[in-house]
Amino acid sequence: MIIRVGSRASRLALIQAQAVVQKINDLLGLNAIIIPIKTTGDLIQNKNLYDIGGKGLFLKEIEYALLNNTIDIAVHSLKDVPAYLPDGLQLAAVLERGNVGDMLVSKIANKITDLPLGARVGTSSVRRRIQLLRLRPDLNIVLFRGNVDTRWNKIFNNEVDATVLAAAGLQRLNYDTSRFCNIISQDEMLPAIGQGVIAIEARKDDKLIMPLCAKINHQLTWQLIQVERGYLKTLNADCNVPIGGLANYIGNNNFEAKFMLGDYNMRYFFYSEVCGKLQHGYDIGVEAAKNFQKKLFV
């Protein structure tokens, strides 16, 4: 049996797909092949994601292939997976979470607070934008699309003074993060929902593939992302809504989580911390979102 693994065609996406293939080989003793698929999100690089349909554009063509049975599973960065999936598809497994943090990449500063007045910071993420401007309202936020390699090169071509990139992506691409890269404190910038997690999507009714996915699923990571995705689904937020969140395991079946919700125009910013038992994680994430909604509609 050969399992067909659908993936975006970017270098990072293919590395992540290969990590899934390796798990399939090592844990299941099965062969798998990667089928690269160009997505709309990859092809349109000169516009903000929220102007052209959101992060779901990185999944659309891959999910179409999944629904049409030309691939058996799809591999995504979980942070790109919307709150709700197409009918007939579901998240089937996740690998163990990588580095969850964001990194400031800059030749001239080690911290956001060290950037010069009016510094140009490249990002297309509204989550990063609002958190940067909360710390430094003087910053000049510049639209910054492209894959990790493209954005990295823009720094060293002096197109901007700094950018913010996911640490997990840089590490998976084997970038030397010992120079020009510094982790941003979670007190300054909460990550995206699901950041650092490689996710596997499959057909709900696939009685062969779903049990196989369960065998490579990292259970603790799965439980923690239920907290985060409960929050995401309740808000039903897309990429034009600045939201972030992270659940961490603290032992004895307990977790703690931090959430933020902002407004693109900086009219409000909500932050909360919650904790509880893993088995109640999804419901606690839902409740955190509802508490923010109550504040919005007071």
UniProtKB/Swiss-Prot annotation:
EC numbers on record: 2.5.1.61
Modified residues (S-(dipyrrolylmethanemethyl)cysteine): 239
Cofactors demanded by this protein: dipyrromethane
GO cellular component term of the entry, any: cytoplasm
Reaction equation(s) it catalyzes: 4 porphobilinogen + H2O = hydroxymethylbilane + 4 NH4(+)
Entry's family note: Belongs to the HMBS family.
Oligomer status and interactors: Monomer.
Name of the featured protein: Porphobilinogen deaminase
UniProt organism field: Orientia tsutsugamushi (strain Ikeda) (Rickettsia tsutsugamushi)
Organism classification: Bacteria, Pseudomonadati, Pseudomonadota, Alphaproteobacteria, Rickettsiales
